Regions:
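A structural motif
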Residues: 34-39, 93, 140, 200
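Active-site beta-loop-alpha junctions enriched in small/polar residues
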Residues: 16-20, 45-47, 77-81, 101-103, ...
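Conserved, mostly hydrophobic/aromatic
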Residues: 25, 32, 43, 88, ...
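Conserved anion-binding
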Residues: 24, 69, 80-87, 93-180
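Hydrophobic faces of well-ordered beta-strands that scaffold small-molecule active sites
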Residues: 11-16, 40-42, 63, 72-76, ...
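N-terminal amphipathic alpha-helix/helix-capping segment at the start of soluble metabolic enzymes
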Residues: 2-19, 26-27
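Glycine-rich, proline-tolerant flexible connector loops at the mouths of alpha/beta enzymes
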Residues: 40-59, 148-156, 212-213
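C-terminal helical cap(s) of enzyme catalytic domains, especially alpha/beta-barrels
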Residues: 196, 210-226
Length: 226
């Protein structure tokens, strides 16, 4: 399989475009680059799996046309992600993560993402136990643990997810796997430190990043976490 990184896992910040300026997404993406960050997290919502609507493949394509060269960490919060992965891959996604909760063939969809030239990830909502993805972790490049209920930004961090994070981190150590372990929801410098201690290496931050007085310093603090 294609691994995103090797051990040890250096921390990565993936600012969420959902918290950017929706009237000028390209400018928000440039803000990420100017902070010295290489990843951009894109939340794609269909209004069915989660009660909100956000971006589509054309958003990714438009950002690429505008010259954005960031690594697109693409999170599909869709009831039928298998219908759209090709469109997102063609639009410029680098990594496509899908949720375990909807009913579809997860293994086939992950393999299809890989066949399209993208890295693949699996996502769990707060109410979904880690065991639900145990059979898939050897097939992915990233596991994303939601630390809020997905759908809207700005929610408070759920500390009860730290145990789940630790369990998924333990699996990769015990099984010799190299997937990245990402968290999304209520992430600021304090909660990122808690997640780092539990085994997280990839941090989605929206409001806390874009509203930071010094985004470069914010990003640097994340990248230097031990």
């Amino acid at each position: 399989m294609l691994h995103v990184c090797g051990m040890p896992y250096a921390p990565i910040l993936a600012p969420s475009l959902l918290a950017g300026d929706h009237a000028n997404l390209a400018a928000s993406a440039r803000t990420v680059s100017e902070a010295g960050v290489s990843w951009l997290h894109l939340d794609l919502m269909d209004g069915h799996f989660v009660p909100n609507l956000t971006f589509g493949p054309e958003t990714l394509a438009a950002l690429r046309r505008a010259g954005c060269q960031l690594f697109f960490d693409t999170h599909l919060m869709l009831s039928e992600p298998q219908r759209y992965i090709e469109a997102f891959a063609k639009a410029g996604a680098n990594l496509i993560s899908i949720h375990i909760e909807p009913t579809y063939d997860h293994e086939v969809t992950l393999a299809r993402i890989r066949a399209l030239g993208c890295q693949c990830g699996i996502v769990l909502n707060p109410g979904t136990p880690a065991e639900a993805i145990s059979h898939l972790v050897d097939q992915v490049d990233l596991v994303l643990v939601m630390t809020v209920q997905p759908g809207f930004g700005g929610q408070p961090f759920r500390r009860d997810m730290l145990t789940k994070i630790s369990q998924i981190d333990q699996w990769r150590r015990e099984r010799g796997l190299k997937y990245r372990l990402e968290v999304d929801g209520g992430i600021d410098l304090a909660t990122a430190a808690e997640c780092r201690a539990a085994g997280t290496d990839t941090f989605v931050a929206g409001t806390s990043f874009f509203k930071s007085a010094n985004r470069r310093e914010f990003a640097g603090t994340i990248s230097q976490m031990q």
